[in-house]
Amino acid sequence: MILPINIYSDDILRLKAKPLKGVDSAIEELIASMFESMRNASGIGLAAPQVGRSIRLLVLDVSCVSKCEHEKPMVVINPHILSVRGHNDMEEGCLSVPGVQGYVVRPAAITLKYRDEHFAERTGEFSGMVARVIQHEIDHLDGTLFVDRMEKRDRKKIQKELTALASGIVDTEYPVVEREVVPIAKPT
């Protein structure tokens, strides 16, 4: 089932998500829906808070990205970055901040402890695009958006777009969470 995506300024995107205690049929269904929603929106990563669930769960599939065709889709539950190496600056975008892109510096490689879709504990080394997407999605689990990590001068350049999103002006080809926009009353 395709789920609507929460958009910039939705409160759930600023909450620290709660750890999962296990995987049941409801979580399995959520995982399948998250993959379907992510692919429908032409995304390569999606965190549960983006679809209205404040839990520490993310999915990613970078196989559509050039030079990443060999990468398999991943389910990451309760992630914890154990170590980081190097850093690089790359342009990012986000399904929750549609139409906005900006450069973000992130570690180039990470060692990650997490649980998979079967809730089996794993530790893995990730680099390149996979490391970047994992870090971007973990930020969602911690209530951080990529625009928060942009240089101040670069963020000023996108302020108009962020203001439009915050006021409910959203143009996407995928479903987003509808919200009531309350107009500011003009003085009489």
Curated annotation (Swiss-Prot):
CDD domains tied to this protein: Pep_deformylase
Co-factor: note: Binds 1 Fe(2+) ion.
EC class of the enzyme, as a word: hydrolase
Gene3D superfamilies documented for this protein: Peptide deformylase
Lineage top rank: taxon: Bacteria
An individual GO BP term: translation
GO molecular function, one term: metal ion binding
Its EC number(s): 3.5.1.88
Keywords: Hydrolase, Iron, Metal-binding, Protein biosynthesis
InterPro entries xref list: Peptide_deformylase, Peptide_deformylase_sf
UniProt cross-references to SUPFAM superfamilies, sorted A to Z: Peptide deformylase
Keyword Hydrolase: yes
Binding site for Fe cation: 94, 136, 140
Active site, renumbered: 137
Any Pfam family hit: Pep_deformylase
Cofactor: Fe(2+)
Keyword Transmembrane helix: no
Membership in a protein family: Belongs to the polypeptide deformylase family.
Record's function text: Removes the formyl group from the N-terminal Met of newly synthesized proteins. Requires at least a dipeptide for an efficient rate of reaction. N-terminal L-methionine is a prerequisite for activity but the enzyme has broad specificity at other positions.
UniProt-recorded name of the protein: Peptide deformylase
Origin species: Pelodictyon phaeoclathratiforme (strain DSM 5477 / BU-1)
